[in-house]
Amino acid sequence: MGDPERPEAAGLDLDERSSSDTNDNEIKSNEEPLLRKSSRRFVIFPIQYPDIWKMYKQAQASFWTAEEVDLSKDLPHWNKLKADEKYFISHILAFFAASDGIVNENLVERFSQEVQVPEARCFYGFQILIENVHSEMYSLLIDTYIRDPKKREFLFNAIETMPYVKKKADWALRWIADRKSTFGERVVAFAAVEGIFFSGSFAAIFWLKKRGLMPGLTFSNELISRDEGLHCDFACLMFQYLVNKPSEERVREIIVDAVQIEQEFLTEALPVGLIGMNCILMKQYIEFVADRLLVELGFSKIFQAENPFDFMENISLEGKTNFFEKRVSEYQRFAVMAETTDNVFTLDADF
């Protein structure tokens, strides 16, 4: 007897099976309010999803550019770092420089085309813009610190030159290319990319801030981690609106897979011990972040991990932490979050 799990056993060849899966996903998409095609997608008002719109306005209010980050004090600090510290920082920056482009690939190729709700499309459009700013910032940091053109080229091509960066990139790229997975599964996967794959590296750079090092690097990291926290929160909000959510078992499978890759990245491939951090505590921190993401998605914790890094308590890996309310370093655009009725323009001022 043939294996019942094999496609031919069910009377389908692989192409037919793939077509069947695609059709199933199309049927499920029609059941999803977020994905249902409508001419309403071309017009923003009246707002149908005020919470999604509010997140878009929050992202808009947080806009910044690479030119606004002062790197003048970083180079003297860089020149005083140990070789291990330089190695670690440069390779982390190489990972980040490539990763934002991958996130944008997903937004352009998949999410922006699949989601039909204009409020969400506004958010994704702005996310694409700010991810480009992040990528420019990381590239500028590499350009500033690394003077050797060959080393610089090696870092800019990290997906090809560094196996451990390639492993993380391949995991994310696989989800972009996957035509069988549901929208909900891919929302979880990219929440894991921005909420888990970035978390340990953010923590490592904040560790440098605690030591008073590299003010330009650490300030840009503060802004970027705030942005990524908001993106992760937005993914969780989109997930809550889904009618056909993936099962808790499937969500846990995706999250655990991401946790294992990130733990390997920062404790074996590019160990945080190089900058004096504790690898065991870093593993715990990644588990803590994963638990927090699971709760925000509406599921129970897996690891029951405590946050081992006190300096990360107020850091914006949740978009709604102190960062936004405190107007971090004044990087909140004037009046963007104000009610429209507050913005009254008159011509009766005294000149």
Curated annotation (Swiss-Prot):
Binds 2 iron ions per subunit. It comes from the Eukaryota. It is found in: Cytoplasm; Nucleus. Fe cation 1 binds at D100, E131, H134. SUPFAM superfamilies: Ferritin-like. The active site is at Y138. CDD domains: RNRR2 (cd01049). PANTHER family: RIBONUCLEOSIDE-DIPHOSPHATE REDUCTASE SMALL CHAIN, RIBONUCLEOSIDE-DIPHOSPHATE REDUCTASE SUBUNIT M2 B. This is Ribonucleoside-diphosphate reductase subunit M2 B. It comes from Macaca fascicularis (Crab-eating macaque).
